Amino acid sequence: MNDKTVTINSNSNTDNKKNKTWQPVRNGKTFIKYLGLNKKISEKDKENLIEDSVNLIGQTINPENIENTVLNSTGLCFGQIQSGKTTSMEAISALAHDNKFKIIILLTGNVTPLASQNTSRVDRALQGREWHVIKNLPRVPWNKSENVNKLKNVINSSLSENKVIAETFNKTVLILSMKNPSKIRRITELFNEVSSWNNSIYDKVPTIIIDDEADHHSLNSQSSKNQADDKDEDELYRVEINETWETIAEKFEKSVRDLKEINPEIPEDQELNPGDLINTEHKDIRTHAAIRDLRTVFNFHSFLGYTATPNANLLTNTLNFLSPNFSQILEPGSDYTGLEFFFCQQKYIDRYISPIEEKIRELEDSNERPKSLEDAFMHFVVSVACGYITGHSNEGNRSMFIHPDRVLESHDQYIKWINAIKMKWEGELKTDKNTEEYKDIIDCIKKSLEGIRDNADEKDEIPEFSETFIQHFKESLTRIIPTKFNAGRGGRIPEIEWDRDYAHLLVGGQGLDRGFTVEGITVSYLSRSVGTRQQDTILQRARFFGYHKKQKNFIKIFLTDELSDFFRDTYHSDRELRMSLKRHSENPENNLKDWPRVWISRNIGNYKLTRPGINNMWGVVSRNLPPPPAREGFAWKMRSIDI
């Protein structure tokens, strides 16, 4: 067996207290109503959604057992790329309301399209008088006085000793917010104003904070810069006689927990000695700091971090307030097409994956249009024409995305190429039918259609080649207009109006990196290089994952050989990670902080698990790195073994 293992063992004596599990009410009115309105989910998938939601809520704080949890209730919700994590957030919110949670805060999307997409879905799904909705989003006016009143109403009724009042006016505040520092600080300021800075009033108000894409922006990417060994002596604090963790923390207005986190080289149970040099300044990113400030408002809350790529969350220092102590593996629906669907066997790779030229960078640099791009676009236009003929255009979308690079100039280059291909084909289709140009383009269209038919499971979905098909191809070609899906220079990433047109072609970089759903994705062209070779970052570019089985006959994914190998290998490592976490969580007494940090992969030496700044011990973990020198009392160990 060629698999490799990277193991990181935590030997630190962290506070491994875990909330006791409890049995939530699963047949409450709001949850039942939500499930009933969700017509797109099959009964079998609803059963899985119910079980996942109940198990997850049952690991959070128990609203009927009020206690001071501070920052000790942090969950990892591990789904798959485009597998319905937003649906889980909706279900969790509905279930939380029925179980007497009074405040739910959803942090989602650091770019406008993603924030708008996800919050609008949640807003539509959670309609009803049981909600006071506060929107903290771009292009949505912030009515401070109205929001203060909404929050006060819920707080006052929930704290009322009159049970009739509390039950009659049973509302939950649902805050839908973009995840950026200023927006998060605005929420914190709102709660501070309502409490007149006496946040103890929230001690009896059960709260859930949901973090969408929890591995992105939320974590402290400056963590590795908190090493005392990497600083000059004048940047550190020298411990004086009789000083302790507690007295120094009080002196610098920090918690003992925070002080120990930024001094990871000192074992947590070790006392300080006079003359020791320690960190007192915490380097972190603004979003991370804003989330910490928001969480400290609530002594009685749970934090749920959703992600499909949890390497960074699992590698962050277990003393950090975002290090999870429980987890829930979210099962995808039966129509999901992801790593397993496309990459578990060679026959599926052969069917759905097409190669991009090995020298794609050289072609781009010389402005030479790649043949694979023409093949991809031909497949897309033929698929769109099929949709118009069969009537699929009346009920959904057919889309294509091109992701060449984060650099804006590359997006311009590919749009010019697509427009040039369009112009060339339109011209050839207008020539006399006896010309070689016309015969060549017709032959290409026919071969593409026959290729789709040959691979299709349902042949009747594929129309016959005919003059009618040629006319639909011409019209489809005209209607497809490529969209530059980036913010330009100082602008915004455009919001796509999926209902306005059937066919969409997006060319972008960052906007297509994570979270964003490309409706009706049919053809994907991912030519971007692996860059810094971070496994989680590359996996997030798989916008072709999702619920696409209904149009599997038309799906085609164009990848470089390197990316194709990456996704094939990642299928195995992702499966191993899920199985390991699932086994660990089967025992309700197990704390996720104690889970052995083990990653198994066939090709783990070629990729980094996550970005360097997250792991403040040795940074990025890779089999290619030499073992670090042994240090007495050090909190972490790393080794690489063959199995």
Residue ranges and their predicted role:
Residues 102-138, 179-182, 406:
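Conserved Walker A/P-loop ATP-binding site and its immediately adjacent core
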Residues 353-442, 446-459, 545-548, 561-643:
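C-terminal helicase lobe and adjacent C-terminal extensions/tails of nucleic-acid helicase motors
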Residues 88, 92:
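Hydrophobic positions on the alpha1 helix immediately C-terminal to the Walker A/P-loop
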Residues 231-255, 276, 281:
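Primarily a LysM-type cell-wall glycan-binding module
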Residues 131-145, 206-209, 214, 224-226, ...:
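Conserved C-terminal RecA-like helicase domain
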Residues 135-137, 205-211, 220-231, 282-390, ...:
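Conserved P-loop NTPase catalytic core
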Residues 146-210, 218-231, 282-294, 508-509:
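Conserved RecA-like ASCE ATPase "motif II neighborhood" in helicase/translocase motors
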Residues 488-565:
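Conserved RecA-like P-loop NTPase helicase motor core
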